[in-house]
Amino acid sequence: MQFFENDSYLRSALRKSVKRTPIWIMRQSGRYLKEYQSIKKQAKDFLSLCKTPDLSSKAALIPIKKFSLDAAIIFSDILILPYAMGMDVNFYENLGPSFLNPISSISDMKNLNVPDPEKNLKYVLDSIKIICKELDKKIPLIGFSGSPWTLACYMIEGKCNKIFSKIKKMIYQNSKELHFLLKKITNSIILYLNSQIIYGVNAIIIFDTWGGILTEEKYCEYSLHYMSLIIKNLFCKYKGNKIPVTIFTKNGGQWIKKIAKSGCDVIALDWSVDIEYARKQVNGKIAIQGNMDPFELYGSFSSIEEETNKILSKFGYNSGHIFSLGHGIYKDTPPENVNFLIESVHNLSKKYHKKNRFKK
């Protein structure tokens, strides 16, 4: 077990005893914080922010200095990897990412690089080094990547459109070519995440944002299969320390039992899933992350406290729960409500850990 002043995130991910439920928030460093906006202005654009270690590390540390969070997460974007593979991507304010030349043929796929993280993604690794030094073993650092399926959705479609008709047509018209692309992305992710681990991250999350648009059969073949391959090839134990892995498939609550067989340590839920149901599905063998609706943070303190207590009570007693939102925090969320949520989770969860049946 890795040593930190506050190791509750790692302990919960591994279903070990804790004194209170840990919390971190998806996009915890983001536009809702004026401090983030200030740092963002120092970069030419979002991509430049991600590629400047001094700035990206500062961005990652903003919420850690502002709130009593139990884990930090690197500041980057899932589409940094396709960019390193040779694709041109732009991030437009309020419109999202866009690829200038989306993949449209097998030759496009063959022309993609499998990037060497030490060369093509060094700015991410350098940011990790800076963050780890600043954290000074106070709390763990989370690294991440998008899932192969989710990255392929953007790379083929060119932008987010919620339907992703081009890649879904490929399933039925050019499945061999699609699997070729997914394998190349998978190999790139394995190298990327293992480099993150070498440089100091203590846990990994795979964000499968668009896995939920598939049928169960296609999800298992085109998304879950490749995430399982990633997990099997990660340095899940590095320098004697277990590196817990989380899978987050948005709108994938119906596949919890299948995800639990992937080799992951934690399943992250969106807000559409009942957390009590999810815990029963994994039978205490996998930790659960989640799963407050981000819109709850627009409510009053009393309503936030009520919903927090509801989620904690539904999960119930003992460890294995990491509190978080069911997706990323919204840009106009009141920071004082975020602080209240964190304090509420810490205070209200203590009673659920007094008699812990898991190993210490």
From Swiss-Prot:
EC numbers: 4.1.1.37
Pathway annotation from the record: Porphyrin-containing compound metabolism; protoporphyrin-IX biosynthesis; coproporphyrinogen-III from 5-aminolevulinate: step 4/4
InterPro entries (alphabetical): UROD/MetE-like_sf, Uroporphyrinogen_deCO2ase_HemE, Uroporphyrinogen_deCOase
Residues the record lists as binding substrate: R27, Q28, S29, G30, R31, F46, D77, Y154, T209, H327
Family annotation (Pfam families): URO-D (PF01208)
Lineage top rank: taxon: Bacteria
CDD domains registered for this protein in UniProt: URO-D (cd00717)
PROSITE patterns, per database record: UROD_1, UROD_2
GO BP of this protein: protoporphyrinogen IX biosynthetic process from glutamate
Membrane-traversing stretches: none
SUPFAM superfamilies: UROD/MetE-like
Subcellular location field: Cytoplasm
Entry keyword annotation includes Lyase: yes
Catalytic function, reaction form: uroporphyrinogen III + 4 H(+) = coproporphyrinogen III + 4 CO2
Entry keyword annotation includes Lyase: yes
UniProtKB keywords: Cytoplasm, Decarboxylase, Lyase, Porphyrin biosynthesis
MF terms (GO), sorted A to Z: uroporphyrinogen decarboxylase activity
Site entry (Transition state stabilizer), positions: D77
A GO CC term attached to the entry: cytosol
Entry's family note: Belongs to the uroporphyrinogen decarboxylase family.
Function as written in the Swiss-Prot or TrEMBL entry: Catalyzes the decarboxylation of four acetate groups of uroporphyrinogen-III to yield coproporphyrinogen-III.
HAMAP family xrefs: URO_D
Subunit structure: Homodimer.
Protein name, UniProt field: Uroporphyrinogen decarboxylase
Gene (name only): hemE
